[in-house]
Curated annotation (Swiss-Prot):
Name of the gene this protein is made from: hssl16
Superkingdom, taxonomy of origin: Eukaryota
One example of a Gene Ontology biological process annotation: sorocarp development
Family of this protein: Belongs to the hssA/B family.
Taxonomic placement: Eukaryota, Amoebozoa, Evosea, Eumycetozoa, Dictyostelia
Signal peptide: none
InterPro entries from the UniProt entry: HssA/B-related (IPR008455)
Protein name: HssA/B-like protein 16
Pfam families with a match to the protein in the record: Coiled (PF05710)
Length: 89
């Protein structure tokens, strides 16, 4: 039973790592599109956008979907703080 359980757990680990790789690729493409859409802000918001993109990039590197959410939220907040000519387009 122990050998069967360990083989089963190895199979589960392989399937989890495959799904993490796929989500990491999709998150990377989403993060890069967020960087392009939310860029070009004036005033103090480029710093906020840069911090959001760096945090998002680090989290995406680990395969966590939260990275994209953090980048998007920081892009929107940066747009609101900078005025009407800035934000995600």
């Amino acid at each position: 039973m122990t050998l069967l359980a360990s083989i089963s757990s190895i199979g589960n680990v392989k399937s989890i790592s495959k799904s993490n790789n796929f989500s990491s690729l999709s998150n990377s493409s989403l993060q890069s599109s967020n960087s392009i859409q939310c860029g070009g802000c004036g005033g103090g918001s480029p710093l906020i956008g840069t911090v959001g993109n760096l945090v998002g990039g680090v989290l995406v590197g680990t395969g966590i979907i939260v990275g994209t959410v953090v980048g998007t939220v920081n892009g929107v907040v940066g747009g609101l703080l900078s005025g009407p000519n800035c934000g995600c387009h």
